[in-house]
């Protein structure tokens, strides 16, 4: 079974969200997603400062098997991207919840972030999507 940390929030598109500040989150793909993708060879991410809209594509992950779109779990501004993935995209496979993170997003304010996180899946609900 895939590793699903209980302290994170999830999307049906197999991304995770970790609150990292009052109005910021860190985003990555789940263990299930990296396992399904196979060996990741390239990650395309937006520039710092880019505006994301929840539910819309913001980049892609390319593996030896396929290319998959990444979808924004929340709306906001990209404040950081994981530049380590440029030279080491395999970090998405080896440490999807740590060194393989994708980007940080700042939401307009703490209330907006609270609302956005509430709309995401908790670990148990995400686990349920994997067994359907």
Curated annotation (Swiss-Prot):
This is Glycine cleavage system H protein. InterPro entries: 2-oxoA_DH_lipoyl-BS (IPR003016), Biotin_lipoyl (IPR000089), GCV_H (IPR002930), GCV_H/Fam206 (IPR033753), GCV_H_sub (IPR017453), Single_hybrid_motif (IPR011053). Keywords: Lipoyl. Residues 24-106 form the Lipoyl-binding domain. Pfam families: GCV_H (PF01597). SUPFAM superfamilies: Single hybrid motif (SSF51230). The glycine cleavage system catalyzes the degradation of glycine. The H protein shuttles the methylamine group of glycine from the P protein to the T protein. Binds 1 lipoyl cofactor covalently. The modification N6-lipoyllysine is found at residue 65. Belongs to the GcvH family. The glycine cleavage system is composed of four proteins: P, T, L and H. Its cofactor is (R)-lipoate. One of its GO terms (cellular component) is cytosol. PANTHER family: GLYCINE CLEAVAGE SYSTEM H PROTEIN, GLYCINE CLEAVAGE SYSTEM H PROTEIN-RELATED. One of its GO terms (biological process) is glycine decarboxylation via glycine cleavage system.
